[in-house]
Design a protein with these regions (language model features):
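Detector for Asparagine
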Residues: 4, 54, 108-109, 212
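Selected transmembrane alpha-helices and immediately adjacent juxtamembrane segments
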Residues: 73-169, 226-247
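Hydrophobic alpha-helical transmembrane segments in multi-pass integral membrane proteins
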Residues: 180, 185, 200, 237-248
């Protein structure tokens, strides 16, 4: 990674285009990248765009909105802007690593191939049990909220330009949808909500939802996670209001 913080954030942001992935699995990847020396602010920039601007998600968005590129461009541009802003802010606020556990075993590249393959399998199992419990817990809470909080209640209060974006962001957080599928849900709200609020839904959900919040809390220090969530929330909300004001 470049030593310049701005170039580092910029590079990490666009790396998300090359690695198709879901927000469910992006946190462990970022944890390992930071453990190998990637600056935390660059890791977060990658974490924010990885589940959004990769080809699989963009194609799903294209199909969900009737083979239209408009929402693909809105979603991509806003996600990139949010990731860059958040990454730069974090680079000034946090100088040291923010991992809860920064111990990573040293890798010996001289071992036999069979041993290396065994280590890969062992590592995969360890990561599954390390982060899987938080994924399951987050999914359980999301399911409970979906069961007891009626979606119609949120939709009823989300008709104004300010409240609609907030409601759709809240809905994205609660539903905790996979980024490959959320566009199909968002498209069903086209007749009810503005384009700006739909963009907020499509950008905010993959960045912050119940599942990945628990995984972030298990991986990073609490203060760092709070700053990330608050900053992402404010920037996404402001971006959606700007889209609304410009009449896009």
């Amino acid at each position: 990674m470049p030593k310049n913080r701005f170039l580092s954030v910029l590079l990490a942001t666009f790396l998300g285009m090359l690695f198709p992935g879901c927000e469910c699995g992006i946190v462990p990847i970022v944890r390992r990248l930071i453990g190998k020396g990637v600056p935390p602010y660059a890791g977060i920039a990658f974490m924010l765009t990885g589940p959004i601007i990769n080809p699989v998600v963009l194609f799903a968005t294209y199909v969900a909105f009737g083979s239209s590129m408009h929402m693909v461009w809105y979603r991509s541009i806003v996600a990139i802007i949010v990731a860059i802003i958040v990454g730069i802010i974090l680079s000034f606020m946090f100088k040291e690593h923010q991992l809860r556990d920064d111990h990573f075993p040293e890798v010996n590249n001289k071992r036999p191939l069979r041993k290396k393959m065994w280590d890969v399998c062992t590592h995969a199992v360890e990561e599954f049990f390390s982060m899987g419990k938080y994924l399951v817990l987050g999914a359980l809470i999301a399911a409970a909220v979906q069961t007891f909080v009626q979606t119609s209640t949120l939709l009823a209060i989300g008709q104004g330009p300010f409240s609609s974006s907030a409601v759709m962001m809240g809905l994205a957080y609660i539903l905790s949808l996979c980024s490959e599928a959320d566009a199909f849900i968002a498209s069903s709200f086209q007749s009810t909500f503005s384009t700006a609020s739909l963009v907020a839904f499509l950008v905010y959900g993959p960045m912050v939802d119940i599942k990945n919040m628990f995984m972030m809390l298990a991986t990073f220090k609490t203060k760092f996670v709070i700053v990330v969530i608050v900053t992402v929330t404010l920037v996404v909300y402001a971006s959606s209001l700007l889209i609304y004001a410009m009449g896009w």
